[in-house]
Amino acid sequence: MKSTAPSYLKHHFLIAMPQMADPNFAQTLIYLIEHGPEGAMGLIVNRPSGLSLADVLEQLRPDEPIPALCQSLPIFAGGPVQTDRGFVLHSAEQQFQATLMLGPLGMSTSQDVLFAIADGQGPQRHFVALGYAGWEAGQLEAELADNTWLSCPADPQILFDLPHDQRLQAAAASLGVDLRLLSTQVGHA
């Protein structure tokens, strides 16, 4: 008898299907940082929070001048869990005080990465979010079985090079899917 080991989706994108009813996740693209038997963790990568890096730096180091470039660096709403906690996905050429290497990317959660970005000494490519999306053991697998999500390998070009409002469709297009043509009604054959 053939054994079937679970397939995990670390370093994949989750693409919300059109019928996604949860407003936290409707029309989202999520980068999966971790996925295993204990659950999953990811960051929504296409939902700006309305804050900029300058707004965050004003809180973290109020006595220092804020570089002008920080006004145009958006902070994204990474998910509904721990929305006051920052996460920085970045190219892997640098490590910081709290960096988890994710293959071609790093994820840092310490303030030093934000200061490095602000000072022009940070990673070449970066994405900053507050909060994350989390799933308990088996929860994401159940949602995938219910056709709530599509998944595809994560593409750093989609994450770093495309405007946020093009990322969801670009990830779907990498699978040959146009989300605008999908029905909001689903079932199982």
From Swiss-Prot:
Q: Which InterPro entries match?
A: AlgH-like
Instruction: Give the source's domain of life in one word.
Output: Bacteria
Q: Which GO terms describe its cellular component?
A: cytosol
Q: What family is this protein classified in?
A: Belongs to the UPF0301 (AlgH) family.
- What is the protein name stated in its UniProt record? UPF0301 protein PST_3956
In its UniProt entry, the species of origin is given as: Stutzerimonas stutzeri (strain A1501)
Q: What is the lineage of its organism?
A: Bacteria, Pseudomonadati, Pseudomonadota, Gammaproteobacteria, Pseudomonadales
